[in-house]
Amino acid sequence: MRLVVQRVLEAGVRVDDTPVATIGTGLLVLAGFGKDDDETLPDSRRWNAMCDKLIDLRIFPDAEGRMNRSLREHGGEVLLVSQFTLYADLRRGRRPSFQTAAPPDTARNLYERLVHDIDARLPGRVSSGIFGALMHVSLINWGPVTLCLDDAELFPEASVAG
């Protein structure tokens, strides 16, 4: 699982020129799943650690302006957007290959579970795009602060099943 996390003042998703989701201050999260991610991932320590890390990242300012507060403490929202292109392979030629991305059905199930699990941790503060849709994503970066989280890099010792 890969997450690109952006701290935003606001963000939104439109599909066919129709607003689907909007948030105020918080995190825009692009979420992608790899071919090694499967239906057992949500039951793993790795999955829970990624969910907790996402909402507990201390990237919001405290009273002194230092990045010292989490989303949970700050009170912001989350907008989750599926993004299979996070698994693009650019080593050959000029056209990206997506062979390392999870199959669409698997990715859809994992994405929907991610939305559910983040919402369980932050009830009523989570919005999402539409899986597989051509989306227009808008945002106003705050900082900017952009972080890339890859479960295989952050938790190499944790097996997908463990």
From Swiss-Prot:
* EC numbers on record: 3.1.1.96
Q: Which GO terms describe its cellular component?
A: cytoplasm
Q: Which Pfam families match?
A: Tyr_Deacylase
Q: Which Gene3D superfamilies match?
A: D-tyrosyl-tRNA(Tyr) deacylase
Where located?
A: Cytoplasm
**Reactions catalysed according to its record:** glycyl-tRNA(Ala) + H2O = tRNA(Ala) + glycine + H(+); a D-aminoacyl-tRNA + H2O = a tRNA + a D-alpha-amino acid + H(+)
At which positions is motif Gly-cisPro motif, important for rejection of L-amino acids?
143-144
Enzyme category, top tier: hydrolase
> What keywords sit in the KW lines?
Cytoplasm, Hydrolase, RNA-binding, tRNA-binding
The molecular function terms of the Gene Ontology recorded here are:
D-tyrosyl-tRNA(Tyr) deacylase activity; Gly-tRNA(Ala) deacylase activity; Ser(Gly)-tRNA(Ala) hydrolase activity; tRNA binding
Instruction: Briefly state the protein's biological role.
Output: An aminoacyl-tRNA editing enzyme that deacylates mischarged D-aminoacyl-tRNAs. Also deacylates mischarged glycyl-tRNA(Ala), protecting cells against glycine mischarging by AlaRS. Acts via tRNA-based rather than protein-based catalysis; rejects L-amino acids rather than detecting D-amino acids in the active site. By recycling D-aminoacyl-tRNA to D-amino acids and free tRNA molecules, this enzyme counteracts the toxicity associated with the formation of D-aminoacyl-tRNA entities in vivo and helps enforce protein L-homochirality.
**Domains: entry comment:** A Gly-cisPro motif from one monomer fits into the active site of the other monomer to allow specific chiral rejection of L-amino acids.
Assembly and interactions? Homodimer.
Q: Which PANTHER family match?
A: D-AMINOACYL-TRNA DEACYLASE 1, D-TYROSYL-TRNA TYR DEACYLASE
Q: What protein name does the entry list?
A: D-aminoacyl-tRNA deacylase
